[in-house]
Amino acid sequence: MASSLLTSPGMIPTTGSAVVVRSVLPFGFSLPSLRLTRPYNKSSLFISCCSPVSEKEATKAIDLKPVVERWPEYIPHRLPDKNYVRVFDTTLRDGEQAPGGALTPPQKLEIARKLAKLRVDVMEVGFPGSSEEEFETVKTIAKTVGNEVDEETGYIPVICAIARSKQRDIEAAWEAVKYAKRPKILIFTSTSDIHMKYKLKKTKEEVIEMATSSIRFAKSLGFIDVQLGCEDGGRSEKEFLCKILGEAIKAGATAVNVADTVGINMPEEYGELVRYLKANTPGIDDIVFSVHCHNDLGVATANTIAGVCAGARQVEVTVNGIGERSGNAPLEEVVMALKCRGAYVMDGVYTRIDTRQIMATSKMVQEYTGLYVQPHKPIVGANCFVHESGVHQDGILKNRSTYEILSPEDVGVVKSQNSGIVLGKLSGRHAVKDRLKELGYELDDEKFNDIFSRFRDLTKQKKRITDADLKALVTTCGDEKLNGANGKESNGYVPVPQISSMV
């Protein structure tokens, strides 16, 4: 799936126009005619689609040339249009809190640069009030990454620091991020009964005063972009959330989030919470509403998407889903869900993430944290674009869209049509014959039948059959009927448990 900004040659849509666009996509994918009604900014739309069509139909589509889109001006409390979803990455703060996932200052700086290439809207890079080293690291990122402007698009990442509702934390945050072109602070406070009673030991009124006074103090220091985070919002009373959010908005907050801190909510439940707060909080439509979900019950991605469907327009995520306990909503899953299905079942929501940077970013985070993803991890796992079943292999060899809804190239994996095929006991004749051809062997039916029979015997002894095994099977078969057995090297895609060896 082409991950590019597209517009019809000679035609620039204007703000508010509705146009029909088509695009040619790899291996049989094509973007169906789609009426797009969200505003344009003298430019084009970041399009993607997961609906397969025939090759014949695909060739009829207009091949649109990629263009570069200027990013709209960043306004803390307002989005460029109602369907735009900001991506707030917290890999370097919440993600680093994953047990065993601590990063060195140079590693945090490198990941921040990688996140900028990914084009996250906001990166939360640390907790300056927690230690001198953390303060200096956040400051370094603000001075460097926070001032690096993409000349073509005008993109500049927002650099965010987190703080408790304490003046010393807020002062430390300001001193650390004030060097960035777009500094931001996230001030959090607990809002659930259990947290207020046992952790804060404060009444609801005291918590509201603590939050609002902290927002006003942050604004007095120079922060223009101030977000209030409701810790344990998923277990908080709805009416109280409406009240504290409303007061925060009056105090000058430009964004608010309601965090499912302990990962207890179900998608329908969390979506309904967001919907209720959007409908009953004074001033909520004048700021950005954000969602922050943890994965204790395995539904962080689903909850985040439910929040977007309910009206949230900022998602807080981490690369590979790393974070406290079972982790956070994974950036790659949320972004690709929005990219793949946003136009079809979510009223056209979209992000500006450069998804081609996803795999490289995932690998870097894995290597630096030592937290490797499981092979079947969606989007970035080693098995994501690999097939062993004979039926699936046959389909993939005919047209990849038969069993893959995403293009590997779209997330930064470069593959050929025949790669992604793993030979084993479930593999069929088509896959084995095709692999032999890639290795340079042109065999008649009799010879291939003999080799395939011995291939089947070999699969009873080995889980996976390598190219060397196939060559040995041919060589020991006698007359090699090669078109030279030319020793042609293969660029096949063979997965291993650690993703660092995958691409």
Swiss-Prot record:
Task: Give binding positions for Mn(2+).
Answer: D94, H292, H294
- What does the UniProt entry say about where the protein is found? Plastid, Chloroplast
InterPro entries hit by this protein:
2-IPM_HCS-like, AIPM/Hcit_synth_CS, Aldolase_TIM, LeuA/HCS_post-cat, PYR_CT
Consequence when changing H294A: Lost catalytic activity
Main location per UniProt?
Answer: plastid
Quote the record's cofactor note: Strongly activated by Mn(2+), Co(2+) and Fe(2+), and weakly activated by Ni(2+). Exhibits 20 percent of activity in the absence of divalent cation.
The chain's transit peptide is found over: 1-49
Which reaction is recorded as catalysed by this protein? 4-methylsulfanyl-2-oxobutanoate + acetyl-CoA + H2O = 2-(2-methylsulfanyl)ethylmalate + CoA + H(+)
**Record flagged with keyword Glycoprotein:** no
List required co-factors.
Answer: Mn(2+); Fe(2+); Co(2+)
Activity regulation (record text): Inhibited by EDTA, Mg(2+), Ca(2+), Cu(2+) and Zn(2+).
Q: Does the keyword Membrane apply?
A: no
Q: Which UniProt keywords apply?
A: Chloroplast, Manganese, Metal-binding, Plastid, Transferase, Transit peptide
Q: Per the record, what is the consequence of mutating H292A? A: Lost catalytic activity
EC code(s) of this entry: 2.3.3.17
According to its UniProt entry, the protein's GO biological process terms are: L-leucine biosynthetic process
Q: Which principal EC class is assigned to this enzyme?
A: transferase
Q: Which SUPFAM superfamilies match?
A: Aldolase (SSF51569)
Annotated Pyruvate carboxyltransferase domain ranges read: 85-359
Q: Which Pfam families match?
A: HCS_D2, HMGL-like
Cellular component, GO annotation: chloroplast
Family (UniProt): Belongs to the alpha-IPM synthase/homocitrate synthase family.
| Quaternary data | Monomer.
Protein's name according to its UniProt entry = Methylthioalkylmalate synthase 1-2, chloroplastic
Origin species: Eutrema japonicum (Wasabi plant)
Q: What is the primary gene name for this protein?
A: MAM1-2
